[in-house]
Amino acid sequence: MPTSFYDVVVLGTRLEPLLCAALLAREGLRVLVLGQGVPEPSYSLAGVEIEPYGLTMAGAQSPIVQSTLEELALRQDVRQRMADRANVVQLLLPEHRLDVYPEADRWLAELGREFPGVRRQATDITRTLAEVRSEFDTVVARGLVWPPETFLERQRFSLTATAQRFDRQGQGWTSWNQLAVRHPLRTAFEAVLPHLSGLVPSQHSDSTRARLHAHVLSGVSDLSGGWSWFQEALFARIRSWGGDVRPRDRADSIRHDGRRGHSIHLARTDEEIGCSQIAHGTAIGELSQLLPERGSMATMFERVGEPRARAYRCSVHFLVEKRGIPDALGPLALRCMSETDPNQVFVLRSRDVESNRMLLSASRLVEEHLVDTGSSPLHFVREEALDAIRGVVPFFDEHAIWVDSPHDGLPPRAFRADTELPCSDPWARGPSTMRAVYDYPTRRALGVCALTTRTPVRGVFLCNEQVAPGLGLEGSFLTATSVAKIIGSQYRRRDWLRRGPWAQRSV
């Protein structure tokens, strides 16, 4: 028998499930959030807090992002913590360096300096990207369900998206297609796509490609405090509205009790909890393992296909002396190792740790066939990151203090003493901790969405990064608001019957 009951149980503590839980708790629903084995957002090494996966605010100006933050009373806090810098992101090519500015005239002047031969094409592309951003904002601001599944949802989505220059699959105008196929600028904008979204470049539609490129030109920022601060802020909002957060607990089974709801079993406390709705926020493969009949998800995979891992995200972190970093290197840079291959790319992030020290992080994608998540360390990850940084930071080895790569299975090492360093959470390391980037057989809703929010099990919803991987941060907000809208509408109908004119009738 269940010992407690909640309206909604949310599984996972990543961005999408936490946003959904906060929105539902704000509406008065009793919400329980379980960590479901999601690792901590940061770890400590030699007194320095490190986030393996940073939170890049690409698309923070989107109407859905701003309205959601406004509902959660976080808009002002996020605005104050967004890093304010003159240049948005740097493109570091083998023979060129560009600072991408949000002001069109400064950006075009930068292009004229590095690529004077394509200034006219770049001007047309920049103007068209601004128009696409405005058109897409009108669709996002309508509060639609992504992806639309019911008849009314599809009808409303089709009417809203009619004015778009893209078809239902998101095909139409291709961003930067006016340049030569192997032009360095086209390669750089193609290489940025997987680092701002959950799709590899070959899976992006024209609409998602143009939307992300417009986000890059309009502003990409980092949060002061990173994902660690944002996660704690969402925890605080959920608790303040009467919800409960248990980041160390996880459910090991879900039992469907028909119309009476669901019951979940907690592995650590051997507790059984009842609920009406479940929002699953980790990979869909983990949801299949929780259900008593794993074949129940087969109907969904027959309709939209089963995602398969295509690549993995990994990062390497260096503590260096601040005087060894060139002033021209910005806080966020895209380091392209080749002018023609968009796969050989590192994203460089830097932040001050002390007055004379700086943390420099390099993240990249590793193809699936190069990774064995269950065994041997990945020696090439650290070496290739060192080569990428040495190409932009002269005499890097003379100023480097230590290096750590939590995903390759190698211990952190000090450069000068050549010794291993102790770190917190040594068990949460290795190739198995890398996040996967999936390959999706089908995509829908202008190419933004891959999986559906509704699962074949009644009352169980999918609320993770696999629903709308095409837009990255903006897609996470679209997923969370869509699931919260679907679940909340059911309770609003019941509330109307309970409080409306029917409650005043007597038989």
What are these regions (language model features)?
Residues 321-418:
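C-terminal segments that line or cap access tunnels to active or ligand-binding sites in enzymes
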Residues 465-488:
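A conserved FAD-binding loop/helix module that cradles the flavin
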Residues 217, 222-223, 252-356, 454:
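Mid-domain catalytic core of redox enzymes
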